[in-house]
Structure formats: C-alpha cells, structure tokens
Regions:
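Internal helix-loop-helix
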Residues: 48-146, 198
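Conserved structured core elements
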Residues: 30, 129, 133, 193, ...
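Structural beta-strand/beta-sheet cores of well-ordered domains, especially the beta-sheet scaffolds
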Residues: 18, 144-146, 179, 197-199, ...
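Buried hydrophobic positions in well-ordered alpha/beta secondary-structure cores of metabolic enzymes
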Residues: 23-24, 183-185, 262
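Glycine-rich, mobile lid/loop segments that gate access to catalytic sites or pores
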Residues: 114-182, 186-193, 198, 209-211
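N-terminal-proximal low-complexity accessory segments that begin disordered
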Residues: 1-49
Length: 311
C-alpha cells in the first residue's frame, strides 16, 4: 500500500469502532466532535506533509524491513542521520501545527521495543523480536498511526506493582491461554490514543521477579474488544462549543489525552513482545526515554518557533 493521504487517514479513523467517553457520555462520532477534531487535524498533518515532494526527505524513509518507502513515524532508525532527520521532521511539524502531533511516542516505542525484544530473545530463545518485526512491517505496509502507552495509574508510588492494594493500578496479565494472554488495567495520559490505529503497551518502571504479571509488552488495535477511552479535559475545551472565535486557543490543531482502560482484552501470541521477563522492563523504559527526550528537542522547538514568530 502507498503512503496514505491525510483524507484517507481521517476516513480510516472514522471507520474504526472505538469506545470513547467524554463528560460522562459516549461520543458516537469522535472524528467530527468539535472538541476532539483539532487533535485529529494535527495527526493528519503528518500524512499531508509526507505527500509533498519538498518534505519527503524528512517525512519518509526506506524501511529496513521491506525496502519500501514508509512514513518516518513508522521507521526503525538505522543511523545517526536518521535521528537527525527525525528531530528536523518534528521541528517542522511543530512549526506547521503549533501543537502536539501525537505520533512521537509511538515512533519512540517502535525503536525501543525493536531492540529490547532482540535482547530478550538472545537470552531466552523467545520469538518476541520476530513478532515485533512482523507487526512493524504490517504497520508500515498500511501506513498506520501507533500510540505508545507506558504510564500506568500507579497508585502508591512507594510500592511495587504487585504490592498495590488494587492489583489493576498497573496493567497486568490476568490469564494465559495457549493462543495468547488476557490483560487488565489502564494506561493514563495517552496523547493521541484517540487518533491511532494501534497501541503498543510497555511497562512503566523497573520490576522484580514478583512483578512477573506486570512485565508485559504487546500491540492491539485501538478498537479491540474491551478497550475504552475516557477523555481528559483542559480548562478551555468547552469554549470550542460556544460559537465564538475568541479565546479558543489553537482552533485548528491540538492534542487530547485519554485514560485507556483494558477490560480483559485478549492479545494473540504473535502480538506479544514481552511477557514476564521482568529484568528487561527497566531496559525498555530506559531506551524509550532516551528516544523520547530527543523527540522533545524537536517538537517543542517547532512550537517555540511559532510562539516567537519565527516559523
């Protein structure tokens, strides 16, 4: 499949069956909701710019998995130059949207999970790396947006996951089957989950042997059965409903966060990238954090360019 256009991206999200709740009610049409639409427009820009010849060197790359042209947000970095182009792409998008364009966490998760799964397989002879490569090739082929999910609700932060009074404050495996696992819990503050086709789950802290059920990484579609999104709000959100052009902030672009709840969600074996290998949880968090700190050096600078009139 060729790179999607922005309009094709919008329609692909419209065709999904996501369970979205806001202000205590189910949102039947998230794509056209006036509060939520600006965040979708921000992601659309990552597709629109990839179609323009003058930006393709930054916005696209050659896949190491397929040899095909892919959106850079789905690319596995192969060189220092890839990292330079990544941060330049992020600055460009910050200049174009003056907002969060929501795909950085997924891209950084891609690269962290790619290398960590290789390390796990080397030690345990598992097939996580092959699982992830197949998933990544699928994402690239269909030009999908992926949400990277790391932050758990956590509860008492002085205690490990297995010590929490409520065992679901960290996302965990509650059942193991011959064909996969069942997970329960939530991921918090998920910018862009609403506008993503897939979600990659990662552990949020280093873990010990007693936390085996919590050391889990996998990917599922955002509209998988049992996933619910509860939209968090910002102070001026409802001003977009008042019909005025005053004090609505960035009217065209924006970001929106969700609490993503997993109510006994099934994950097939070929979508599992870690399951119980607790000593690798910290490695995955650390590698992700390194990539994501670099991302902030691109997107925030681009938004800063807008704020000082230099975009």
């Amino acid at each position: 499949m060729a790179l999607m256009t922005g309009e094709q991206y919008i329609e692909s999200i419209r065709n999904m069956k996501m369970q979205v709740y806001m202000f205590g009610k189910k949102v039947e049409n998230p794509v056209d909701d006036p509060i939520l639409r600006p965040s979708l427009n921000s992601v659309r820009m990552t597709y629109d710019l990839a179609q323009k010849p003058e930006y393709q060197d930054l916005m696209t790359a050659t896949s190491n998995l397929t040899g095909q042209q892919v959106n850079r947000f789905t690319h596995i970095h192969q060189s220092a130059q890839d990292l330079v182009k990544k941060v330049k792409m992020q600055r460009l998008l910050g200049q174009q949207t003056a907002a969060c364009f929501q795909r950085c966490v997924g891209m950084d998760a891609f690269n962290a999970v790619y290398s960590t799964t290789y390390e796990i397989d080397q030690k345990y002879g598992t097939s996580y790396h092959e699982n992830f490569k197949k998933f990544a090739a699928y994402v690239q082929e269909h030009d999908l947006t992926v949400d990277g999910a790391m932050t758990d609700p956590k509860g008492d932060r002085s205690k490990a996951p297995h010590e929490q009074e409520d065992p679901d404050l960290f996302l965990r495996v509650v059942e193991r089957r011959p064909d996969g696992i069942v997970v329960r819990g939530a991921k918090a503050h998920q910018t862009g989950a609403l506008n993503s086709h897939e979600i990659i789950i990662m552990p949020t802290i280093s873990m010990g042997p007693e936390d085996k059920d919590y050391a889990v990484s996998f990917a599922v579609p955002m509209d998988a059965e049992g996933i619910f999104m509860i939209i968090g709000r910002q102070s001026c959100d409802t001003r977009k409903l008042e019909g005025s052009e005053l004090d609505v902030g960035n009217a065209e672009f924006g970001g929106v966060e969700a609490l993503v709840v997993f109510d006994d969600v099934f994950v097939p074996n070929d979508r599992i990238f870690m399951c119980g290998e607790t000593e690798f949880a910290g490695m995955l968090v650390e590698r992700f954090a390194g990539y994501h700190r670099q991302s902030y050096g691109g997107c925030k600078v681009g938004v800063g360019d807008v704020l000082i009139g230099a975009a």
